Amino acid sequence: MAYRKMLKSKIHRACVTQADLDYEGSITISPELLKVANILPYEAVNVWNITAGTRFETYAITGEKGSTDICVNGAAAHLVTPGDLVIIASFTQILEEDCAAHEPTVVFVDQFNRLKEIRPERIGVKSRIPYPA
C-alpha cells in the first residue's frame, strides 16, 4: 500500500497577535479554530508567513476558549511579528487510491481571527479575500 502526504486543512490568513520567545515552542490557537480546522493539540503544523515569507514547522496548542489570539512561541517567535498574516497548515497520510477524492478544509478568518468561512480547498479556486487585506 502506498500513502501520500496530503494537505488536511489550513487556517488561511490568520493574524499573529503575539510572539513569545520565553514559552516552549508551539503555536497557540483557540479551541474553536482548532476544531473547525480538525487540528488536534500537539499536532504538527506548518506555518507560512505571508507577510515576511518565512516558513516553519511547530505544533499546535489550545488557547483560551473564545480567544482570537494566534501566538507563536519559542524559537519560532523570531520568525514572526505581531500583525503578520500566516497560513497554518496540517497534513495527513492518505492511501494513494483515495487521493483523487480528497478535499482539504480551508478555514478563513477575518482580520481579528474570527471565523469567516469554512469550505473545501479546490484547485483553481481563488480566495475571495483581496491581497493585501
Curated annotation (Swiss-Prot):
It comes from Legionella pneumophila (strain Paris). The active site is at residues 26, 59. CDD domains: Asp_decarbox. The keyword DNA damage does not apply. Heterooctamer of four alpha and four beta subunits. GO terms for cellular component: cytosol. HAMAP family: PanD. Its EC number is 4.1.1.11. Pathway: Cofactor biosynthesis; (R)-pantothenate biosynthesis; beta-alanine from L-aspartate: step 1/1. Is synthesized initially as an inactive proenzyme, which is activated by self-cleavage at a specific serine bond to produce a beta-subunit with a hydroxyl group at its C-terminus and an alpha-subunit with a pyruvoyl group at its N-terminus. The modification Pyruvic acid (Ser) is found at residue 26. GO terms for biological process: alanine biosynthetic process; pantothenate biosynthetic process. Gene3D superfamilies: 2.40.40.20. GO terms for molecular function: aspartate 1-decarboxylase activity. Coiled coil: none annotated. This is Aspartate 1-decarboxylase. Substrate binds at residues 58, 74-76. The keyword Chaperone does not apply. Keywords: Autocatalytic cleavage, Cytoplasm, Decarboxylase, Lyase, Pantothenate biosynthesis, Pyruvate, Schiff base, Zymogen. It is found in: Cytoplasm. The gene is panD. Pfam families: Asp_decarbox. InterPro entries: Asp_de-COase-like_dom_sf, Asp_decarbox.
